[in-house]
C-alpha cells in the first residue's frame, strides 16, 4: 500500500525478513523491495522501521549496534516498548515515532495512533503521518502512556468485533437458520448498522429507533444493559485486561 499509494514513488525499501512465505507474499505485489535474511553491516537509511515482536527487540537492537547501522529517524510498530527504551537499547538520541496500527491496514481502513518524540522534526512528522494515512485514519497522540490504552482499544479491537460476529452467527444458527443464512443475517445486519451510524452519528438515538416499549428489542436490551452483568461491564473488564497486559509487556522489555 505504501509503495502503490505514496507520493514518494522513488523511495527505496530494504527489508530484513527471515520467513520465506512473507517474502513471497510481498514479491507477488510486484513492487521493488530489497530483501535480506540478516541485518547488513554498515547499512544506511533515512528511516529504520521496527516491526518485530517486542520480546525480540533486544536481540535485534544488539545486532544493529554491532553492524554499525546508520539511520536518521526511528519508527516503531512494537507494542509496549517506550521511546526511552528504544533509544537505550540502540544507544542513540535520535527521534523516535511510535505507531500503533491495527489489522484493518490490510484493506487501507486501519486506525493508526501515532506518537512522535519531542525531538522529531515537523517535516518528518508530516511525512510519516502521510505515509500511514495511506493505510487508514491517523490519530496523533501527545501522551505516550496512552499507547497502552490504544493497544487495548483499536489494536485488539478488531478481535472483539470478530468474536461478536462469531457469537451472533452461532446464535442465529442455534435458532434454526442454515449456516449460510445465519452468516448473511449477521453480516448484513452489522453492515447496515454501520452505515446508519455513519449517517446519524448518535448510537443512543439509533437504539431508540429500533426499540419500542415492552417490545422484543427492549427485552433483549434489558439483558445487555444490566448494571453488573451487562455488555458494558463485560467489555470494560475485557479492555482493562488487555490494557493491564500491555502495561506488563512494557515492564518486561
What function would you assign to each model-found segment?
Residues 4-27:
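NAD(P)-binding Rossmann-fold cofactor-contacting core
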Residues 20-24, 29-30, 38-114:
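Rossmann-like NAD(P)(H) cofactor-binding subdomain of soluble oxidoreductases
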Residues 23, 57, 96, 178-186, ...:
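Small-residue helix-packing motif on alpha-helices
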Residues 32-39, 139-141:
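Short acidic-hydrophobic, aromatic-tinged amphipathic segments that line or gate anion-handling sites
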Residues 85-95, 111-149, 160-199, 245:
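Internal alpha-helical scaffold of NAD(P)-dependent oxidoreductase catalytic cores
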Residues 148-159, 207:
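A short glycine-threonine-serine/GTX helix/turn-capping micro-motif
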Residues 187, 191-253:
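NAD(P)-dependent Rossmann-like dehydrogenase/reductase catalytic/cofactor-binding core
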Amino acid at each position: 500500500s505504501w509503495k502503490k499509494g505514496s507520493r514518494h514513488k522513488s523511495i527505496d525499501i530494504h527489508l530484513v525478513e527471515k520467513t520465506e512465505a512473507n517474502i513471497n507474499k510481498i514479491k507477488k505485489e510486484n513492487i521493488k523491495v530489497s530483501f535480506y535474511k540478516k541485518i547488513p553491516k554498515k547499512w544506511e537509511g533515512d528511516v529504520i522501521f521496527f516491526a518485530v515482536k517486542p520480546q525480540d527487540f533486544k536481540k535485534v537492537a544488539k545486532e544493529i549496534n554491532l553492524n554499525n547501522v546508520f539511520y536518521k529517524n526511528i519508527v516503531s510498530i512494537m507494542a509496549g516498548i517506550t521511546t526511552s527504551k528504544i533509544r537505550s537499547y540502540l544507544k542513540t538520541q535520535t527521534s523516535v515515532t511510535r505507531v500503533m496500527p491495527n489489522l484493518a491496514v490490510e484493506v487501507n481502513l486501519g486506525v493508526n495512533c501515532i506518537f512522535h518524540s519531542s525531538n522529531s522534526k515537523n517535516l518528518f512528522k508530516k511525512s510519516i503521518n502521510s505515509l500511514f494515512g495511506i493505510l487508514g485514519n491517523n490519530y496523533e497522540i501527545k501522551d505516550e502512556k496512552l499507547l497502552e490504552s490504544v493497544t487495548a482499544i483499536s489494536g485488539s479491537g478488531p478481535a472483539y468485533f470478530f468474536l461478536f460476529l462469531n457469537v451472533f452467527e452461532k446464535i442465529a444458527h442455534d435458532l434454526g437458520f442454515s449456516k449460510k443464512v445465519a452468516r448473511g443475517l449477521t453480516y448484513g445486519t452489522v453492515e447496515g448498522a454501520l452505515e446508519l451510524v455513519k449517517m446519524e452519528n448518535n448510537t443512543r438515538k439509533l437504539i431508540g429507533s429500533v426499540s419500542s416499549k415492552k417490545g422484543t428489542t427492549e427485552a433483549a436490551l434489558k439483558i445487555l444493559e444490566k448494571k453488573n452483568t451487562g455488555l458494558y461491564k463485560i467489555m470494560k473488564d475485557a479492555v482493562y485486561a488487555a490494557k493491564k497486559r500491555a502495561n506488563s509487556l512494557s515492564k518486561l522489555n
